[in-house]
Regions:
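N-terminal secretory signal peptides that target proteins for export/translocation
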Residues: 1-3
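Hydrophobic beta-strand scaffold residues
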Residues: 114-116, 308, 343
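Aromatic-rich peripheral "rim/lid" segments of glycoside hydrolase catalytic domains that contact
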Residues: 318-387
Length: 387
């Protein structure tokens, strides 16, 4: 990509999220300039680097390839228990913060913006349900430590995501996140915050979430609908979705492949998986596409005029037909572009990853699907087959 083309693309993205309705976007909600257009532009195209903080980092060459392709944002899930005093010793917390600092330095040097995502596991989630005061204390201590790292980096390049997928009741989270946001704002006065609703941050959970008083906030949703498609071939053999394989997208009751899968599940007595499939077939009858599932978030944005990012979405590679996976990814990012939402694919190189395991490089078809470039995706499934 030439320097001129990079400048033109950046200018186009800044235009798309200004108060002037963009000529190329289908339905962008006009937003007040409470979050700078440059920061929203930085969130426009990204991926999750899950496993970097608590595992092996991606290679610099891979990060450079993705940056050159047009990715501008990396979401860094930080295992919450590794930076909370209740769950980790001082040495472990310090080591985790050093890894985070190194990651932010490298990403910034490559031209990325980064989100620091406080990403809890089962231990914190149990505490969060059982002891609200203790959980709030742990979140505050975690952010006190994370802020020490974040404030050494450019404020316009780092975002602070307060808590991934809060696993408590909506009313309680509303009160907690207002308190937590005020606390983090005191630590990071110039940093844009990212927050989301409960219930796995689903789009249909956002209407029950009130925007914060803090104006410098982006609102994050996660998208994996229909789950029977995106999580087919599930890694846990006890999960009913483990029994579903080769389900195409869109889901159509008249599709011979869908009918064959139903018959197979019936023959194997996979009752729960069959019920989940039938529910998905019924849901897709009238509106099978992403717009059906994402409409509640759009309605919320139209009401409150706040910026949105879909900072998790993806399809498990183990069971999904390849062309259907590409089609779903392309549909999600096309919807996001049409509404001037940012996005971050889940994830880089694991079960949902955009990296081709055989080459260790970005899968070119996945990149075309995500970035909306023309190519083989525009050919019909009938012409290519769906594997």
């Amino acid at each position: 990509m030439t320097a001129l083309r990079r400048r033109l693309l950046a200018a186009a993205m800044l235009l798309s999220i200004s108060l002037v309705r963009p000529v190329f976007a289908e339905d962008c909600v006009p937003l007040p300039s409470t979050v700078s257009p440059e920061r929203l532009a930085a969130l426009s195209r990204g991926f999750n680097a899950d496993g970097w903080i608590n595992g092996a980092p991606p290679s610099r060459a891979l990060l450079q390839q993705l940056r050159k392709a047009g990715m501008s944002h990396v979401r860094l899930p930080v295992p919450a228990e590794r930076v909370m005093p209740r769950f980790a010793a001082t040495d472990e917390r310090a080591a985790t913060l050093r890894v985070l600092d190194s990651a932010l330095k490298q990403l910034t040097s490559l031209g990325y913006s980064s989100s620091v995502d406080l990403h809890p596991g089962e231990r914190f989630n149990r505490l969060h349900k059982d002891d609200p005061d203790a959980a709030m204390g742990e979140m505050q201590e975690a952010w006190r430590a994370l802020a020490e790292v974040i404030r050494t980096h450019p404020a316009d390049r780092i975002f602070a995501e307060l808590l991934n997928e809060p696993d408590i009741e909506a009313d309680r989270w509303q009160k907690e996140v207002e308190t937590l946001a005020a606390f983090v704002r005191g630590l990071l006065p110039a940093t844009t915050l990212i927050v989301g609703p409960v219930n796995w941050q689903r789009a249909d959970s956002l209407p029950r979430f009130r925007p914060l008083a803090d104006p410098d906030v982006v609102y994050a949703i996660h998208f994996y609908d229909p789950m029977v498609f995106t999580h087919q071939g599930h890694w846990d053999a006890r999960d009913p979705l483990h029994d579903i394989m080769d389900l195409p997208y869109p889901i159509n009751a008249g599709d011979p492949k869908v009918q064959a899968l139903r018959q197979d599940l019936q023959a194997r007595g996979a009752v729960k998986a069959l019920a989940m499939l039938d529910t998905a077939i019924a849901a897709a009858k009238d509106k099978p596409g992403a717009d059906r599932w994402l409409a509640p978030a759009l309605a919320w944005q139209q009401q409150f005029s706040r910026p949105i990012i879909v900072n998790e979405f993806g399809v498990l590679k183990a069971g999904a037909p390849r062309q259907s996976r590409l089609r779903w990814l392309a549909e999600v990012t096309a919807y996001a572009r049409a509404h001037c939402w940012g996005w971050a694919h889940w994830e880089l190189a694991q079960g949902f990853g955009l990296v081709d395991a055989a080459t260790g490089k970005p899968d070119p078809d996945v990149m075309r699907a995500l970035l909306g470039a023309p190519g083989r995706l525009e050919r019909s499934p009938a012409a290519r087959g769906d594997r």
